[in-house]
């Protein structure tokens, strides 16, 4: 991972155009090729970003005499031809880290079993729901359950034993990413847990995410559709 704190301006060129004027920002370049631009607010959300696969080309900026100005132009381009054009005026700090392979989120036994039970009995979320798959892979980690509602629209489900704000934020990130996929959108969100904290429920509802309280014992008591041996 490469972290650059720099004074920069940013232009997005693609389906629309957007401009960020000159300011101090964090430029984050990850090993997967993604590039994101952050300000010192907005929690985890970048001001702008480009997801992989994409390319990054850095070119020194010269004046009329061909002399280097000390500035550089970063051009980040995806396969659709959309570009982030980052004019780096001054670098305050730059560091590179090799974080290695991340083991991913490790669920406790109850959360893992809740996911298994809910996937098997997906109509717990509502009549007409059908399962697409468990652990649906994305660039930022697997979605616990991806399914369709009775209208045939995609639903991403995040499962927790105790649902807090962090879980809602995690589901929000998945929804932002999945809703860029033309084959999946619109993608709705369901935050499912045995217990949901009031602050998390308020945040979820504010973001249009449905909250569902799961009864673990009741789910365990539902007769399985799969053959089991005792």
Curated annotation (Swiss-Prot):
Gene3D superfamilies named among the record's database cross-references: 2.70.180.20, 3.40.1350.10
Subcellular compartments: Cytoplasm
GO CC, alphabetical: cytoplasm
One Gene Ontology molecular-function label: DNA binding
Pfam families registered for this protein in UniProt: NucS_C, NucS_N
UniProt keywords, alphabetically: Cytoplasm, DNA-binding, Endonuclease, Hydrolase, Nuclease
Transmembrane segments: none
Enzyme class of the recorded protein, top EC level: hydrolase
EC number: 3.1.-.-
Function, as annotated: Cleaves both 3' and 5' ssDNA extremities of branched DNA structures.
Entry-linked NCBIfam families: PRK03298.1
Protein name stated in the entry: Endonuclease NucS
Species assigned in the record: Corynebacterium glutamicum (strain ATCC 13032 / DSM 20300 / JCM 1318 / BCRC 11384 / CCUG 27702 / LMG 3730 / NBRC 12168 / NCIMB 10025 / NRRL B-2784 / 534)
